[in-house]
Structures are given as C-alpha cells and as structure tokens.
Amino acid sequence: MSRACELTGKTVQYGNNVSHANNKTRRRFLPNLCNVTLISEVMQQSYRLRISANAVRSVEHRGGLDNFLTKADDKELSQRARLLKRQIVKKKAEQAAA
C-alpha cells in the first residue's frame, strides 16, 4: 500500500529541517491519509478509499464522490478510482437514456 492519495494523487514530498544555525537535515513530508468510506449515489454502494484529508474536503465541496470523480482528471486518480469513475459515467449515461 503506497503512501499516496487515491483521488488527488498526493504523495510523499522530501525537504529539509532547517535549524536556527541553518543546519539542514533531510526529512519526508507525509500526506495526511485517512481510510474513508464514501457512498456513491449513482451506484447505490459504499466504497472504502485511502485518501488525504484535503481530498475529503474536496469531495464534500464538489457534492459527493460521483461529482468529484466525473470532474477529476484521470492522471491524478488511482487505477481503482479510474475504474469506479468509468462505472459511474456509464451508469449515469444509462439513467439519462432511460
């Protein structure tokens, strides 16, 4: 399991701790990942995802998992999230046709 957000693609970043004497030591900045269960209204199902706290706020801001995924760029999403996005878009198209 990698330290990357499944929805936004946020990963580990590297930098320095800088002391008062300007000594620099390498460190890692880890994303604030949470195991969250999100509900898809279109699919009538809940999905467990490992996403950053920032992604949780973004999902709520866009009005839920379905809206977030339909507007999200595929290159930021994990493979699992891309598959879910394709299923949601397909199901929305079926509902619109019916």
Curated annotation (Swiss-Prot):
Cross-referenced Gene3D superfamilies: Ribosomal protein L28/L24 (2.30.170.40)
Lineage top rank: taxon: Bacteria
A GO-annotated cellular component: cytosolic large ribosomal subunit
InterPro entries (alphabetical): Ribosomal_bL28 (IPR026569), Ribosomal_bL28/bL31-like_sf (IPR034704), Ribosomal_bL28_bact-type (IPR001383), Ribosomal_bL28_sf (IPR037147)
GO molecular function, one term: structural constituent of ribosome
Gene Ontology biological-process annotations: translation
Name of the protein in its database record: Large ribosomal subunit protein bL28
Family, as annotated: Belongs to the bacterial ribosomal protein bL28 family.
Organism: Bartonella bacilliformis (strain ATCC 35685 / KC583 / Herrer 020/F12,63)
One Pfam family, short name: Ribosomal_L28
Alphabetical UniProt keywords: Ribonucleoprotein, Ribosomal protein
